[in-house]
């Protein structure tokens, strides 16, 4: 700054500071303008040192002048500043900038005349080029000065800053003044990184060079001696000419200005680039309805500079288009200004115009003094004179408008002072600039209700408060319920804190400013002596008079201090006086936000009567409630509240003290559901080892969080009086009640919000929060750690959460969440198993709970036998004798718990390892560790999914449980050590379709090993006897039969009672296994039985399946096959007749074997077979299911995916960081997919509606993603009549079709990705390939053909179905060829032209049309030949 100050001497600086920026304006030049100018010059690659002399200033003006026409506002300001500075150096008296410019113009005109005169005098004697950088050296030769790095640097900066916006062109023009083509190429090379732009430029240059060559053909013959060749286009572009040649051409007589020509070409190219980078035509620049005029002008000129047009055209555009494209409000004003208005005048006139609402007001304000008629007013001269008196909406002073006001912005409406709307929307007529009626009465304390406080407050609110005394402000906190009542004036900061002050006998309005050191008032006379002073503020420096010891009264408080008087935009009371009157800034923390709670829809609050209580309980409750009422936790209520919940009292465990309990069961049933914020409890094995640890407990946790106001009435309860002496006392809760279902979730979320700022400020602290237990760990020294803990306690206290010392644990071992934490290990708090002679259900439940808790660290704990005792519904107090196994299990557990066991803490740098052992009877135990014998945690697994299972399956489930648990605790999966050989696993995995993925694992030889007890053969066993088995049962009587027929003619049938179809099928298999040799082939038609046995269970809850397993283990080889219905398969048809006798009536359909043949050939889908061969869908489906080509993974355990024609599965998948929404038509595999901008409900719903508009969608099946569960998607489904189903969370199989299509789609995208620039293109290409270019699957179709086929078939089937149902309403009476009697009535199955197909009892017959009478079934029986029915022909 010192260096810049040297530009002017002291005397010159005084002159400088007297010159006004504009004629009649208040602002004058300041030192800062010189500083700004010197910085700006550096950007233009001009030496700021030139500012120090008048000669330097003249050079700068000469450099800037050519760019003025096309330059920006900044360039113009720079020119004006340098011109004024030149006048100061030259000691030319000027009052303002305009005068300075006029003086410069005069001087330039004079010097021009002189130069012309001199040129005339000397003729063309001087050949010196005026073009810098070509200069004449002392020997008179023309030499080239290379373009300076400074110029190049300025050029690079311009391009980097402005990219290719219109400003680039004037800057290029200015920087390349007089340059040779070589210099210009240097400039272009420095910005060569912008390849696309440079390519466009190159093309323009090539076109121009070709055009030059066309217009300047080469002269024939040799060049005369001493003459230069003429430049070609490529010479001008500097590619085929040397620097010497370029200088020669430029300085020749007559010259060929190759530099200027080349520059012109480059500017043409730049214009094209600019148009591409900011492709707006000047005609498109229109002022928006609410756009400030100044912004519009900036846009207009920016685009104007990019236009390729002559200066005359540009001037015309400015004159006409600028006004023409302004918005209606500005246009009215501009037209009133008349045609010759300057831009400056236009901008002044249009200030503050912001949309239609302002029009009348701005005009009225700007012309408030005009009393002439409207027509006179609109004349330009009148308007000009009136324009000066504008008044500011913000501070109410005249001479400037709100946009330029330096006073802080007033909150609320500028017209009426009220909040909630802006001035343009104000309905009041009269603007009230001085705002006597401020939005709150002065000097009075203003009370907030808690809602009001919350309605307009961020978390912290700033208030200015005076104390009556000058004590510290420790007590000045708001009470927690939110009502604030101070005994001193309180000013909120929703408005500017303006107050009335009394000084020197005058009343003034002043702003309380805690950021100002001094008190500054606008011009006024004060008694006493004063000192001159300069003070700095946001708007620069101002000169003031300093008066000391001035008495001043602020809102009734007297103070004496220093007051500064000067040109301040607003009166300011600074800290020097505010501290005297005890004014402080307070930040009362806003009360905890209440979470809105509702009852379930259509329900009312609980109305449960209070049951009688003993005297001592009533006394205890009265005492507790009085105390709670004092603390504001509950409030008394009147009889208007109709709700009630019973209350009672119990003694606390450890004392004689009573505890109040409210039975909120009824209210809980009626309260809305909450999302549990924490899904599980934190586990110590997941804690990292910390140097310092503290455990805190929040006292009265729930009672520190307010309950939603509208919900409080439902928590009403009554304390009865003894002997009903008086009506009971009624209360309701103001805080979260214990025992109410919403308390945990609301407390957790409030606590998280409160701890968040503390967590952010202290990232080095680890804070685990579960309900009211806090674990805080850090690697700080204990002293620093404890300081942090105190900060945390203070932070919680500010929100009203106490952390009682009694439960504040500073030294290990720490008791936390039922665990004991030591510095380098952890365990569960000591567990004592009770010794009892008799055990009740409740005792056993508690015992199992304790053992489950201990199993986290004590390996080998079992509870299966104890749990078996609890099966069935029993009363809690029922005594249960322990079985021998349970006694044994309990004794083993006692042994395990005798030795205390410890776990260690997690080390993120080491791998996790999980080891599993089999304990027998379906129980497993596991340990997770990082170093051998140092367990992080242990556990057990004994869950049986499904009735029949085997060890491999259970092991897989255990692995998945442990993997999930590890992800929750440590965020990663461990490596597994499993007691199963790789071969066994591989066998199982390849054979069993439902085997799921398990993480990385290795075999560990810990007996007992897991093995498969038997294996089923893949091919029929040659030479072994084949048993066709079947069973049938009657649903009503529950009687059944099971049996078999063998290929050797053996057969057996047994009768069963109280059975089902499924049981009889299994019974038949059991019979076959019992009666067969060591090798056997078994053929069944039961999918159910096949499904159970193929999964190779080794134990089952079903006695029958267990017996089958025993038999299977005894066999050497077993082949089990499934066939669909029994027609045409000899053994099966026979056995079916055997077992069906008297059990079921099956109509065998001829079509089955034909359908099977057809399916083997073409693999047609079940729908096609059902319609072609008239099969029931279940049979057709089973044919497909038994085909190994169509069914890669066997039948699904829980039935197949639903393949109805209207079902689609939707899912989002991610690729390259983008979201692809995929919809798959389940039955055909046809895909619709799209890249969507975001995974939101809005986008999903839009996609869904598009899908429904293209295809018949009846059901969509999605996962539980938030976009699919959103209200928008539900609404779209409702509107389009689509049923929405959700998958099973965390079970990818429930979304199997779309998941596999995602993989397929990604695979195809991978194949075509390099053919497309954008992912969205690649996605559509992949969809096309998948739908139409990949054939295969059912029917050998492509997915596109298949969906059309399925939908068409579906329509036809429905039509056919309608006809069939119609046909079935008819009965047929027919004659046999040899028998003259009419037979019937038979059922009509099909009616053709010449014959009908009928079903009489179980026979299907074809009868010629002429021998059949078809009638409607009116329920009448045939009486004889001439019966009425016989004559009702149906043709």
Swiss-Prot record:
Residues 277-363 are annotated as: Dimerization/Multimerization of capsid protein p24. It holds the Pfam family Gag_p24_C. It catalyses: Specific for a P1 residue that is hydrophobic, and P1' variable, but often Pro; Endohydrolysis of RNA in RNA/DNA hybrids. Three different cleavage modes: 1. sequence-specific internal cleavage of RNA. Human immunodeficiency virus type 1 and Moloney murine leukemia virus enzymes prefer to cleave the RNA strand one nucleotide away from the RNA-DNA junction. 2. RNA 5'-end directed cleavage 13-19 nucleotides from the RNA end. 3. DNA 3'-end directed cleavage 15-20 nucleotides away from the primer terminus; 3'-end directed exonucleolytic cleavage of viral RNA-DNA hybrid; DNA(n) + a 2'-deoxyribonucleoside 5'-triphosphate = DNA(n+1) + diphosphate. The record marks 221-222 as: Cis/trans isomerization of proline peptide bond. A lipid is attached at residue 2 (N-myristoyl glycine). Mg(2+) 1 binds at residues 697, 772-773. Its cofactor is Mg(2+). Residues 12-19 are annotated as: Interaction with host AP3D1. A zinc finger (CCHC-type) spans 390-407, 411-428. Binds 2 magnesium ions for reverse transcriptase polymerase activity. GO terms for biological process: DNA integration; DNA recombination; establishment of integrated proviral latency; proteolysis; symbiont entry into host cell; symbiont-mediated activation of host apoptosis; symbiont-mediated suppression of host gene expression; viral genome integration into host DNA. Residues 1021-1144 form the RNase H type-1 domain. Residues 14-33 are annotated as: Interaction with membrane phosphatidylinositol 4,5-bisphosphate and RNA. Zn(2+) binds at residues 1159, 1163, 1187, 1190. Mg(2+) 3 binds at residues 1211, 1263, 1299. Mg(2+) 2 binds at residues 1030, 1065, 1085, 1136. Residues 1370-1417 bind DNA. Residues 73-77 are annotated as: Interaction with membrane phosphatidylinositol 4,5-bisphosphate. One of its GO terms (cellular component) is host cell. The active site is at residue 513. A motif (Nuclear localization signal) lies at residues 26-32. Residues 8-43 are annotated as: Interaction with host CALM1. HIV-1 lineages are divided in three main groups, M (for Major), O (for Outlier), and N (for New, or Non-M, Non-O). The vast majority of strains found worldwide belong to the group M. Group O seems to be endemic to and largely confined to Cameroon and neighboring countries in West Central Africa, where these viruses represent a small minority of HIV-1 strains. The group N is represented by a limited number of isolates from Cameroonian persons. The group M is further subdivided in 9 clades or subtypes (A to D, F to H, J and K). Resistance to inhibitors associated with mutations are observed both in viral protease and in reverse transcriptase. Most of the time, single mutations confer only a modest reduction in drug susceptibility. Combination of several mutations is usually required to develop a high-level drug resistance. These mutations are predominantly found in clade B viruses and not in other genotypes. They are listed in the clade B representative isolate HXB2 (AC P04585). This is Gag-Pol polyprotein.
């Amino acid at each position: 700054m010192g260096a810049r100050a040297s530009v002017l001497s002291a005397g010159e600086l005084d002159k400088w500071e007297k010159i006004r920026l504009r004629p009649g304006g208040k602002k004058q030049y300041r030192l800062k303008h010189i500083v700004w100018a010197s910085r700006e010059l550096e950007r233009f690659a001009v030496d700021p040192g030139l500012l120090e002399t008048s000669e330097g200033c003249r050079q700068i003006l000469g450099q800037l002048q050519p760019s003025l026409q096309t330059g920006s506002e900044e360039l113009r300001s720079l020119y004006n500043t340098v011109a004024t500075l030149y006048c100061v150096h030259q000691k030319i008296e000027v009052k303002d900038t305009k005068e300075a410019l006029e003086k410069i113009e005069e001087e330039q005109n004079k010097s021009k005349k002189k130069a012309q005169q001199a040129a005339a005098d000397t003729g063309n004697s001087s050949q010196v080029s005026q073009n810098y950088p070509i200069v004449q050296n002392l020997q008179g030769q023309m030499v080239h000065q290379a373009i300076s790095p400074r110029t190049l640097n300025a050029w690079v900066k311009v391009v980097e800053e402005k990219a290719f916006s219109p400003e680039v062109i004037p800057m290029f023009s200015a920087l390349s003044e007089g340059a040779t083509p070589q210099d210009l190429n240097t400039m272009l090379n420095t910005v060569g990184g912008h390849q696309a732009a440079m390519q466009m430029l190159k093309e323009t240059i090539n076109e121009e060079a070709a055009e030059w060559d066309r217009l300047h053909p080469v002269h024939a013959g040799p060049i005369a001696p001493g003459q230069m060749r003429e430049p070609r286009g490529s010479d001008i572009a500097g590619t085929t000419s040397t620097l010497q040649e370029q200088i020669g051409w430029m300085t020749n007589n007559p010259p060929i200005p190759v530099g200027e020509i080349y520059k012109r070409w480059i500017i043409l190219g730049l214009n094209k680039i600019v148009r591409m980078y900011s492709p707006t035509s000047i005609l498109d620049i229109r002022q928006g309805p609410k756009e400030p005029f100044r912004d519009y002008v900036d846009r207009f000129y920016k685009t104007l500079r990019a236009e390729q047009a002559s200066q005359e055209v540009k001037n015309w555009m400015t004159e006409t288009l600028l006004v023409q494209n302004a918005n209606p409000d500005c246009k009215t004003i501009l037209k009133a200004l008349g045609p010759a208005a300057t831009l400056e005048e236009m901008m002044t006139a249009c200030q503050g115009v912001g949309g239609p609402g302002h029009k009348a007001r701005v005009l009225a304000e700007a012309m408030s003094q005009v009393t002439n008629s409207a027509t006179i007013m609109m004349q330009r001269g009148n308007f000009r004179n009136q324009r000066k008196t504008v008044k500011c909406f913000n501070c109410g002073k005249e001479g400037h408008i709100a946009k330029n006001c330096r006073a802080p912005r007033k909150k609320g409406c500028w017209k009426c002072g009220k909040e909630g709307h802006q001035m343009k929307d104000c309905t009041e007529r009269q603007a009230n600039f001085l705002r006597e009626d401020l939005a709150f009465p002065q000097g009075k304390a203003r009370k907030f209700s808690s809602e009001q406080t919350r309605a307009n407050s961020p978390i912290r609110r700033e208030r200015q408060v005076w104390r009556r005394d000058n004590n510290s402000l420790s007590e000045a906190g708001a009470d927690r319920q939110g009502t604030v009542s101070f005994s001193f004036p309180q000013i909120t900061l929703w408005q500017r804190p303006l107050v009335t002050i009394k000084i020197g006998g005058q009343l003034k309005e002043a702003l309380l400013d805690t950021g100002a050191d001094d008190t500054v008032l606008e011009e006024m006379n004060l008694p006493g002596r004063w000192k001159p002073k300069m003070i700095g503020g946001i708007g620069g420096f101002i000169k003031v008079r300093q008066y000391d010891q001035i008495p001043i009264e602020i809102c009734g408080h007297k103070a004496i201090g220093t007051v500064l008087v000067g040109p301040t935009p607003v009166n300011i009371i600074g800290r020097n006086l505010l501290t005297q009157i005890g004014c402080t800034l307070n930040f009362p923390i806003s009360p905890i936000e209440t979470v809105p709670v509702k009852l379930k829809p259509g329900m009312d609050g609980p109305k449960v009567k209070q049951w009688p209580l003993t005297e001592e309980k009533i006394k205890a409750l009265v005492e507790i409630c009085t105390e709670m009422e004092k603390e504001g936790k509950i409030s008394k209520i009147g009889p208007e509240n109709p709700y009630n919940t019973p209350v009672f009292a119990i003694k606390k465990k450890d004392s004689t003290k009573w505890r109040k309990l409210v039975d909120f069961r009824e209210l809980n049933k009626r309260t809305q559901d909450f999302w549990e914020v924490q899904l599980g409890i934190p586990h110590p094995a997941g804690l990292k080892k910390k140097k310092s640890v503290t455990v805190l407990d929040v006292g009265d946790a729930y009672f520190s969080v307010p309950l939603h106001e509208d919900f409080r009435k439902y928590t009403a309860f009554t304390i009865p009086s003894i002997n009903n002496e008086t009506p009971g006392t009624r209360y309701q809760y103001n805080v979260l009640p214990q025992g109410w279902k919403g308390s945990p979730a609301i407390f957790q979320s409030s606590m998280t919000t409160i701890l968040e700022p503390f967590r952010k400020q202290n990232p080095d602290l680890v804070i685990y929060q579960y309900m009211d237990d806090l674990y805080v760990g850090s690697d700080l020294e204990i002293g620093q750690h404890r300081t942090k803990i105190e900060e945390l306690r203070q932070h919680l206290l500010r929100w009203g959460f106490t952390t009682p010392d009694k439960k504040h644990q500073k030294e290990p071992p720490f008791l936390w969440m039922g665990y004991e934490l030591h510095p380098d290990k952890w365990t569960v708090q000591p567990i004592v198993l009770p010794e009892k002679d008799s055990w009740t259900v409740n005792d056993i439940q508690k015992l199992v709970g304790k053992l489950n808790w201990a199993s986290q660290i004590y390996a080998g704990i079992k509870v299966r036998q104890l749990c078996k005792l609890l099966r069935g519904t029993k009363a809690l107090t029922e005594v249960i004798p322990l079985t021998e196994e349970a006694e044994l299990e309990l004794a083993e557990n006692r042994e395990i718990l005798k030795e205390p066991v410890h776990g260690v803490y997690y080390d993120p740098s080491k791998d996790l390892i999980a080891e599993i052992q089999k304990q027998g009877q379906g129980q497993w135990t596991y340990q997770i560790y990082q170093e051998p014998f140092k367990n992080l945690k242990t556990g057990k697994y004994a869950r049986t999914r499904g009735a029949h299972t085997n060890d491999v399956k259970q092991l897989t489930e255990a692995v998945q449980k442990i993997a999930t648990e590890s992800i929750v605790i440590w965020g990663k999966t461990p490596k597994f050590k499993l007691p199963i050989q790789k071969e066994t696993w591989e066998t199982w995995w390849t054979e069993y379709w439902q085997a799921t993925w398990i993480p990385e694992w290795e075999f560990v030889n810990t007996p007992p090993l897991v093995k498969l007890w038997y294996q089923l053969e893949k091919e029929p066993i040659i030479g072994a006897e084949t048993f066709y088995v079947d069973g049938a049962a009657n649903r009503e009587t529950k009687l059944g039969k099971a049996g078999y027929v063998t290929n050797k003619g053996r057969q057996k049938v047994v009768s069963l009672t109280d059975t089902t179809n499924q049981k009889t099928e299994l019974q038949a298999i059991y019979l076959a296994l019992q009666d067969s040799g060591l090798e056997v082939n078994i053929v069944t038609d039961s999918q159910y039985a096949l499904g159970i046995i193929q999964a190779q269970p080794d134990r089952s809850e079903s006695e029958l399946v267990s017996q089958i397993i025993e038999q299977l283990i005894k066999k050497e080889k077993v082949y089990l096959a499934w066939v669909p219905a029994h027609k045409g398969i000899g053994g099966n048809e026979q056995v079916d007749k055997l077992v069906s006798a008297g059990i079921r009536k099956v109509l065998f359909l001829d079509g089955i074997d034909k359908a099977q043949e057809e399916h083997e050939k073409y693999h047609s889908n079940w729908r096609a077979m059902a319609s072609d061969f008239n099969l029931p869908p279940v049979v057709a489906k089973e044919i497909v299911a038994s085909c190994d080509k169509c069914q890669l993974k066997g039948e699904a355990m829980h039935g197949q995916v639903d393949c109805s024609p209207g079902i689609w599965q939707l899912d989002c998948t991610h690729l390259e960081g983008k979201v692809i929404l995929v919809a798959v038509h389940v039955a055909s595999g046809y895909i619709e997919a799209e890249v969507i901008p975001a995974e939101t409900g809005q986008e999903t719903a839009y996609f869904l509606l598009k899908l429904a508009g293209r295809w018949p969608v009846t059901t969509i099946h999605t996962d539980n993603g938030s976009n699919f569960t959103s209200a928008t998607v539900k609404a779209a489904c409702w509107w389009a009549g689509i049923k929405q189903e959700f998958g099973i969370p965390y079970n990818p199989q429930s979304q199997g079709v779309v998941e596999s299509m995602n993989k397929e789609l990604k695979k195809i995208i991978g194949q075509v990705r390099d053919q497309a620039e954008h992912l969205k293109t690649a996605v559509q290409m992949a969809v096309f390939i998948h739908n139409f270019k990949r054939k295969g699957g059912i029917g050998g179709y492509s997915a596109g053909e298949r969906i059309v086929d399925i939908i068409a078939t579906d329509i036809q089937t429905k039509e056919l179905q309608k006809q069939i149902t119609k046909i079935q309403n008819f009965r047929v009476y027919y004659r046999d060829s040899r028998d003259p009697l009419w037979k019937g009535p038979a059922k009509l199955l099909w009616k053709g032209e010449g014959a009908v197909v009928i079903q009489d009892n179980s026979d299907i017959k074809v009868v010629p049309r002429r021998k059949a009478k078809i009638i409607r079934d009116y329920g009448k029986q045939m009486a004889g030949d001439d019966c009425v029915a016989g004559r009702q022909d149906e043709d």
